[in-house]
Design a protein with these regions (language model features):
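Zinc-dependent metalloendopeptidases
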Residues: 1-261
Length: 261
């Protein structure tokens, strides 16, 4: 049963920069102990392999090398930030750097995660850099890694991308999503349909399905028709907006604390 299929305006994703994608360009294997190995299909954007619009799997050269080695990327504890501490720095060229300050304060005040200014003692760190898109790798990659931010990306988008850097995937890509949502691929440009593939998680899905997660796509993500591409199969809780970028939900906090106990 579909709960909501109303016509609504398409969210202006150009402002956030989270939905800059392209045609499918290839695939890479990723896996976990809990769910085995799965193939992720990605788009080639700015010489990067981009998954689901804003997740950086690596450079195209890195992906090509991985494919030649027939390797599988195993996600899990190795990609966690030790002691839940994430050193960061901000590129001086980043427009509106206060949004990073606000996003850091949001994570630090609501979770046990601590984003701290980078010092010379920090070999692994995140650097916030200007870009035409907003995107991040998932989890700690080692050395310097970037969170790219579009010029108009709001604080909520910064919080979202920081969630990826911590190790959180998109909520609507959970293993159990079919019980809660239906995806209308007929309303999505065929070149962008790969963005709705389900990922391989690095553990069991945490808690109940969270429509209000800051890690959830908005209902009209990648829509070409003005109608929802993500439809609820169960009632969305009162006051909850699918795809909101206002604040971490209780479910987001729980997920962060589960992978950083």
């Amino acid at each position: 049963m579909i709960i909501d299929d109303t016509l609504r305006p398409v969210i202006d994703t150009d402002d956030t920069g989270e939905f800059h994608s392209g045609p499918e360009a290839g695939s890479v294997l990723i896996g976990s102990v809990a769910h085995g190995v799965r193939e992720l299909r990605y788009a080639a954007v700015d010489d990067l392999a981009i998954f689901e619009g804003d997740i950086v799997l690596g450079t195209l050269d890195e992906i090509d090398a991985r494919r030649r080695q027939e390797g599988v990327v195993i996600s899990g504890a190795v990609f966690r930030w030790p002691n839940a501490v994430v050193p960061f720095e901000v590129d001086p060229a980043l427009p509106a750097p206060q949004r990073v300050v606000d996003a850091v304060a949001h994570w630090n005040s609501r979770t046990r995660i601590r984003f701290v200014p980078r010092t010379g003692a920090h070999g692994d760190f995140v650097r916030f850099v200007p870009s035409t898109s907003s995107r991040s790798p998932v989890g700690r990659r080692g050395g310097r890694q970037t969170i790219e931010l579009a010029p108009s990306a709001p604080v909520g988008t910064v919080v979202h991308e920081m969630g990826h850097a911590l190790g959180l995937w998109h909520e609507q890509s959970r293993e159990d999503r079919g019980n809660f949502i239906a995806v209308r691929l007929d309303r999505v440009d065929p070149a962008h349909r790969h963005n709705f593939d389900q990922h391989i998680t690095d553990g069991d899905d945490v808690g109940g399905y969270d429509f209000g997660s800051i890690m959830h796509y908005p209902a009209t993500a990648f829509s070409t028709t003005g109608q929802a591409t993500i439809l609820a199969r169960v009632p969305v809780p009162p006051g909850v907006t699918m795809g909101q970028r206002s604040a971490l939900s209780a479910g987001d906090v729980n997920a962060a604390h589960t992978i950083y106990p």
